[in-house]
């Protein structure tokens, strides 16, 4: 699993544990997710390419470094992925935002796209796909396949929790796409929930059932 990165920073692990607690309120869960996504954004963007530019400080001219290439794109897998956006935008406020909506066909159990909205000129952009949970991995794999049609420079997948099954599915379909997660949990149950997990991330973010 050389392309799987578990972010084990103490603050990330501390906040994730607080989110897992069943008595965490919607407000607390949402706040912690924002803080976690900000912390994770630092790790995920660590290898972004840089270019040299000449600038004027108040005292002299110097060569500084800025991010190279087109603006980064954050792509949320609806709806729970939206909970990642504000925290990540704290780190990369100039990023563009895309959304992709998928549901599982009850007969085939395969993901079906119902919404796809991206910024213009996606070719040669770096994309970070966000979804709190990597469970079966089918939706993540479908989303990445759809995004590859736009010929981006790179794609990364970021989640809070991953199941081994989801990691295997996404890696098999897209071995070139790195996975960043705060934890890899034990397994999926019969209903497709990650164990021990944290429940339904979308419901806990938005206060729904």
From Swiss-Prot:
Allosterically activated by GTP. One of its GO terms (biological process) is uracil salvage. It comes from the Bacteria. Pfam families: UPRTase. Its cofactor is Mg(2+). One of its GO terms (molecular function) is GTP binding. Gene3D superfamilies: 3.40.50.2020. InterPro entries: PRibTrfase_dom (IPR000836), PRTase-like (IPR029057), Upp_B (IPR034332), UPRTase/APRTase (IPR050054), Ura_phspho_trans (IPR005765). 5-phospho-alpha-D-ribose 1-diphosphate binds at residues 79, 104, 131-139, 200. Binds 1 Mg(2+) ion per subunit. The magnesium is bound as Mg-PRPP. Keywords: Allosteric enzyme, Glycosyltransferase, GTP-binding, Magnesium, Nucleotide-binding, Transferase. Its EC number is 2.4.2.9. SUPFAM superfamilies: PRTase-like. Pathway: Pyrimidine metabolism; UMP biosynthesis via salvage pathway; UMP from uracil: step 1/1. It catalyses: UMP + diphosphate = 5-phospho-alpha-D-ribose 1-diphosphate + uracil. Uracil binds at residues 194, 199-201. Belongs to the UPRTase family. Catalyzes the conversion of uracil and 5-phospho-alpha-D-ribose 1-diphosphate (PRPP) to UMP and diphosphate. NCBIfam families: PRK00129.1, upp. This is Uracil phosphoribosyltransferase. It comes from Acidovorax ebreus (strain TPSY) (Diaphorobacter sp. (strain TPSY)).
